Amino acid sequence: MKPNVVSADVLFEEFRNLLKWEWVAGLGASERRFAEVAVRAARSGADLVGYLNYIHPYRAQVLGEREIAYLTNATPEDCKRRIARIVTLEPPVLVLADGQAAPDEVVSMCERAQIPMFSTQESAAFVIDVLRAYLSKHFADRTTMHGVFMDILGLGVLITGESGLGKSELGLELITRGNGLVADDAVDLYRINQTTIEGKCPELLQNLLEVRGIGLLDIRAIFGETAVRRRMRLKLIVHLVRKETLERDYERLPYEPLTQDVLGVPVLKVVIQVVAGRNIAVLVEAAVRNTILQLRGIDTYQEFVERHRRAMERGGAS
């Protein structure tokens, strides 16, 4: 699900302190929003904000020094035509950056067309970076998954599995080994760009871990600030299963790395069998270390296959 609403007044208040901008025109259009068609088609925040460009309608248009020069340094007829074309773009908001003074013609156009215009001393590049990051997260595809989301050895790991296998207890043991908790039970996941999933904890559950028989634990209060994380990028899913499930549904040595689709992004996946006597925390950390190697281009299984092939060739030659 992708939210499709952010109005000019919300955007203005969100960055009033950071960008120190002023609302210089179009005050009566505080409810003006990004067009739903643009939001649905956007692949990231980069599609929703940028420098003035006549071939990209429906996005926030930023006017820096060069854009203002283009609009004002021409014959009166050309200047009027260039400014009038902005209306056809139907921007949700115009942002005047680089400390540029608002040309009277642009202000008049915004008042007539009821287009909000903000003015800031900050550079146009900085304004675009800030707005793109905000809009990427605000309009991101999102979902909620059940599991324990953790920072393990610097990697965002989502622990999932069948009910009653001890996911939260495993999370607690991993915390005692120096890893960090992001979320327990419900994990909010966002696709912030075409290849990246970011996860965080719902506000109601922040810092909390539920362990059967003990109840709710405030991890931040018990283990300190370093035991919790606000958000992490999802890089690995560790799925816990019972012995019969593993034997029925999974190969012992899969030829290709397992993946799971999350919001259209393939995420590496490891399946771990849970039986009495196994140190699951050690196995999870080993899986994470192996995933880090895979992300660096080192595939232990493929290296073994190649080693086995060379051994067979040597045996056949002799």
Curated annotation (Swiss-Prot):
ATP binds at G161, E162, S163, G164, L165, G166, K167, S168. Keywords: ATP-binding, Kinase, Magnesium, Metal-binding, Multifunctional enzyme, Nucleotide-binding, Serine/threonine-protein kinase, Transferase. One of its GO terms (molecular function) is protein serine/threonine/tyrosine kinase activity. Its cofactor is Mg(2+). InterPro entries: HPr(Ser)_kin/Pase (IPR003755), Hpr_kin/Pase_C (IPR011104), Hpr_kin/Pase_Hpr_N (IPR011126), P-loop_NTPase (IPR027417), Ser_kin/Pase_Hpr-like_N_sf (IPR028979). Its EC number is 2.7.11.-, 2.7.4.-. This is HPr kinase/phosphorylase. It comes from Acidovorax ebreus (strain TPSY). The gene is hprK.
